[in-house]
C-alpha cells in the first residue's frame, strides 16, 4: 500500500518487485564498497617487501681470516653463490699469460665496478670476489685451481670450468675464447670493512 491524498491505494506486484530490486542493489553496493576497502589493505601490504625479502637482498659479510692461499670461500648473496678466492703469488703471476686467449682481457664489458676494472679484477690483488654463475646459461662453474690437469690441458693456469657446456674462466674470472659463455663473470660491489672482512653487495658509494 502507498499513501495518497485520499488515503491508501494498493501497489502492484510489479511495483513491489522494482522497489525490492532497488533496495537489494543499494545494499549490495554498500557491502561491495566496504568489502573492497578491506580487500585493498592486504593487497597494498603485499606490495611492500617483507622482512625476509629485504634480508635476502641485503649485503652480506665474508670472513676471510682463515682463507689460505689457493682456497675458495663460498658465500650466498641474493640467492646467488659468491666466490672469494685467496690467490697465491703463483696464481697472480700466471694471469697475464692468459691474456691472448681471453675474450675480454681488459674487462671492457662492464661486468664489474669501475674500481675492479684492472688486471686482477679486484680491490686487493690477492682476493678475487666474483659471482659464481656462468654467463652462458646460469650454471655454476667448478673451481679448478690446479695447473695443467689432464682434462683441461697443460696450458691451464687455474680458474673455473663449467661442466655443463665447457665454458672456462681464468683466476680473474675472465672468459676464454671459443667457449659458449660470452662475457666475463660478474664482480659484485664490495668493500673491505677491515683486513679480514669483506662486505658483499655494497661499496663506499652506496654505503
From Swiss-Prot:
Protein name: Ubiquinol-cytochrome c reductase iron-sulfur subunit
Top-rank taxon, per record: Bacteria
Organism this protein belongs to: Allochromatium vinosum (strain ATCC 17899 / DSM 180 / NBRC 103801 / NCIMB 10441 / D) (Chromatium vinosum)
Cofactor: [2Fe-2S] cluster
GO cellular component: plasma membrane
Membrane topology field: Single-pass membrane protein
Pfam families: Rieske, UCR_Fe-S_N
Function, as annotated: Component of the ubiquinol-cytochrome c reductase complex (complex III or cytochrome b-c1 complex), which is a respiratory chain that generates an electrochemical potential coupled to ATP synthesis.
Main location: membrane
Gene behind the chain: petA
Catalytic reaction(s) noted: a quinol + 2 Fe(III)-[cytochrome c](out) = a quinone + 2 Fe(II)-[cytochrome c](out) + 2 H(+)(out)
Binding site for [2Fe-2S] cluster: 134, 136, 162, 165
UniProt xrefs under InterPro entries: Rieske_2Fe-2S, Rieske_2Fe-2S_sf, Rieske_Fe-S_prot, Rieske_Fe-S_prot_C, Ubiq_cytC_Rdtase_Fe-S_su_TAT, Ubiquinol_cyt_c_Rdtase_Fe-S-su
Amino acid at each position: 500500500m502507498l499513501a495518497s491524498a485520499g488515503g491508501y491505494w494498493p501497489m502492484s506486484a510489479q511495483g513491489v518487485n522494482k522497489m525490492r530490486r532497488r533496495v537489494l542493489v543499494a545494499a549490495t553496493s554498500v557491502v561491495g564498497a566496504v568489502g573492497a576497502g578491506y580487500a585493498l589493505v592486504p593487497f597494498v601490504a603485499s606490495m611492500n617487501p617483507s622482512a625476509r625479502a629485504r634480508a635476502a637482498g641485503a649485503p652480506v659479510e665474508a670472513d676471510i681470516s682463515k682463507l689460505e692461499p689457493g682456497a675458495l670461500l663460498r658465500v650466498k648473496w641474493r640467492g646467488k653463490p659468491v666466490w672469494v678466492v685467496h690467490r697465491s703469488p703463483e696464481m697472480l703471476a700466471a694471469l697475464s699469460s692468459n691474456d691472448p686467449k681471453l675474450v675480454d682481457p681488459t674487462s671492457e664489458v662492464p661486468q664489474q665496478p669501475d674500481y675492479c676494472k684492472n688486471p686482477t679484477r679486484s680491490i686487493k690483488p690477492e682476493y678475487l670476489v666474483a659471482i659464481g654463475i656462468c654467463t652462458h646459461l646460469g650454471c655454476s662453474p667448478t673451481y679448478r685451481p690446479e695447473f695443467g690437469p689432464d682434462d683441461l690441458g697443460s696450458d691451464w693456469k687455474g680458474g673455473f670450468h663449467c661442466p655443463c657446456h665447457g665454458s672456462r674462466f681464468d683466476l680473474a674470472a675472465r672468459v676464454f675464447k671459443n667457449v659458449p659463455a660470452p662475457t666475463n663473470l660478474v664482480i659484485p660491489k664490495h668493500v673491505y670493512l677491515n683486513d679480514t672482512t669483506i662486505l658483499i653487495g655494497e661499496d663506499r658509494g652506496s654505503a
